[in-house]
Amino acid sequence: MSIPCLTEETAKTVLRQVEFYFSDSNLPIDDFLKKTVTESEDGLVSLALICSFSKMRGYLKLGDSKGDDIPEDTIKAVADTLRTSSALKISDDGKKVGRSTELLKLEDLIEQLNARTVAASPFSYDVKREDVESFFSQYGKVNSVRMPRHVAESRIFSGVALVEFPTEEDAQNVMKQNLVFAGQELELKPKKEFDNEREKDEVKFANYQPQKGSANQKNGSDHKNNSAYEPDYPKGLIISFTLKRSAEEGTTEQKSSEEPTDKTMEESETKPADTPDADKENTGEVQAEGAEDEDDEKEEKGALATHKDNKDVVLREDLKAVFGKFGDVKFVDFKMGSETGYLRFDEPEASQKARAAAVLANEGGLAVKNFIAVLEPVIGEAEKEYWTLLRSKDRFDKGGRGGRGGRRGGRFGRKRGSDSPGGRWNKSQKVEA
């Protein structure tokens, strides 16, 4: 029976991936693979194990197969492909793989790796690794691109890409450049500086304590011994945000919605967590939030179709996509063109994670298109006022369309074209074009 061959594209991808696994760039810092190689008498590792790694399963279309479940003909096809590499060694039976040369001392390798690696930022949370690699390939060969997760939330990209070049000289040459990616001027620094800053961020996050009455204090737990002080609303779910231009030369205002749109970046490999639509009811909670009138809903849908790809216009959907990484976003109180708004999470822990991530960010907030969202907690009397207004509005609206409210002219009773505090808790001013 003939052994099936990999397609040319799959063979190239598999070869590159396995070479990376055993490279000077990865092996010294890959604890699992390094331990497996060290424990092997001949320095070779089961090829079935390598094929069971998540990326390899994807390339080979193996689904959730484990090492013992990898088809033998697939292993043989991969072995034939890897035999063409000068960096890899394949056992005679084609079932094991390893480096063709010995690994240098770990300390020396890490020092060399750091010297030829550049830390570049800021990148959007949904940027693709392939796009970053393609961008830097314009300035020299790229060995690898790493995208470390955020200190405050492991599911979120930190915004810093670690780009490794073949030599220290190559890295130094790149850091002398003035580079702009997707409209953002990049800050370039040695990886050692990034490592030092990250260590400080980890300590800062470990010592981070939210303000009293904030995210991790549910339902008045700070007064748990005195029921008279316990509020009758959930605490720590609301945060406010202010949008500021992320580019140094920009203003704090959003551009007019009449400006032409820019081509957006491709979707990330990991899409933002699904979040409920802003116009859905929240069972057992304030329903006025989800009861936007038809005109407001049409306006938002029209804006989404027109400005989805415009990096200079922030929509509610953009905010839900960014903050949905931290938890379920129940409602976004924001109108296109405004500088400020409010977010309500389903759980206080999500609010806490979002604020912690913003505190640790070099920009002082979280990137939303071409803007930085600077976060503040809504606590104390401000939080009480928010819930009081929502609930009073809910009672008023239940006289309308079957509990979803009559024609109110927008969120929280805001009349169209009005941002006055008398009708809407969000007192933000509209930004003139």
UniProtKB/Swiss-Prot annotation:
Expressed ubiquitously (at protein level). It holds the Pfam family La. One of its GO terms (cellular component) is ribonucleoprotein complex. GO terms for molecular function: mRNA binding; RNA binding. The keyword Chaperone does not apply. Disruption phenotype: Embryonic-lethal with deficient embryos arrested at early globular stage of development characterized by nucleolar hypertrophy. Keywords: Nucleus, RNA-binding. Residues 4-108 form the HTH La-type RNA-binding domain. SMART domains: LA (SM00715), RRM (SM00360). Residues 206-233, 245-310, 395-433 are annotated as: Disordered. Residues 298-419 form the xRRM domain. Binds to the 3' poly(U) terminus of nascent RNA polymerase III transcripts, protecting them from exonuclease digestion and facilitating their folding and maturation. PANTHER family: ACHILLES, ISOFORM A, LUPUS LA PROTEIN-RELATED. This is La protein 1. It comes from Arabidopsis thaliana (Mouse-ear cress). The lineage of its organism: Eukaryota, Viridiplantae, Streptophyta, Embryophyta, Tracheophyta.
